[in-house]
Curated annotation (Swiss-Prot):
It comes from Volvox carteri (Green alga). Keywords: Chromosome, DNA-binding, Isopeptide bond, Nucleosome core, Nucleus, Ubl conjugation. Belongs to the histone H2B family. The nucleosome is a histone octamer containing two molecules each of H2A, H2B, H3 and H4 assembled in one H3-H4 heterotetramer and two H2A-H2B heterodimers. The octamer wraps approximately 147 bp of DNA. It holds the Pfam family Histone. There is a cross-link at residue 153 (Glycyl lysine isopeptide (Lys-Gly) (interchain with G-Cter in ubiquitin)). Gene3D superfamilies: Histone, subunit A. This is Histone H2B.3. One of its GO terms (cellular component) is nucleosome. InterPro entries: Histone-fold, Histone_H2A/H2B/H3, Histone_H2B, HISTONE_H2B_site. Its main location: nucleus. It is found in: Nucleus; Chromosome. The keyword Ubl conjugation applies. Monoubiquitinated to form H2BK143ub1; may give a specific tag for epigenetic transcriptional activation.
């Protein structure tokens, strides 16, 4: 854009040297105005820096959300069954891993069943069949009855 400004003063016959002299201070003034705006932007960045702290907090929240565990639920069930019994952190970690493994096995089996039946959706029927295949004997029966009870409660609510 600077060459265009120089072309305009060149088209004006005698005033060209004076305009160039004026153009230079204008060019100097424009960056000064931009410099004044730059600190204002820095001031605007400082509150967003606080927002970045907020972003860091939300990043921490996102990290917490990624590590979903069943620890709270394991503890609640433990207190229902044995109210005076505690559990160590290592045992809690083992139980959490156990639940994740069982969940993965049931989900994988249900996915296979839906593929065998050429259905795109995993329904409660596939889950129920997968539980019967993955869990042994009496445990499968109890899991199916509890699952059926939970689905009935969910659909009625």
């Amino acid at each position: 854009m600077a060459p265009k400004k120089e072309e305009k003063p060149a088209s004006q016959a005698a005033e060209a040297p004076e305009v160039k002299a004026e153009a230079k201070p204008k060019a100097v003034k424009a960056p000064k105005k931009k410099e004044k705006k730059a600190p204002a932007k820095k001031v605007a960045k400082e509150p967003s820096a606080g927002g970045e702290d907020g972003d860091k907090k939300s990043k921490k929240k996102a990290k917490v959300a990624k590590s979903e565990t069943y620890k709270l639920y394991i503890y609640k069930v433990l207190k229902q069954v044995h109210p005076d019994t505690g559990i160590s952190s290592k045992a809690m970690s083992i139980m959490n891993s156990f639940i994740n493994d069982i969940f993965e096995k049931v989900a994988t089996e249900a996915s296979k069943l839906s593929r065998y039946n050429k259905k795109p959706t995993v329904t409660s029927r596939e889950i129920q069949t997968a539980v019967r295949l993955v869990l042994p004997g009496e445990l499968a029966k109890h899991a199916v009855s509890e699952g059926t009870k939970a689905v009935t409660k969910f659909t009625s609510a």
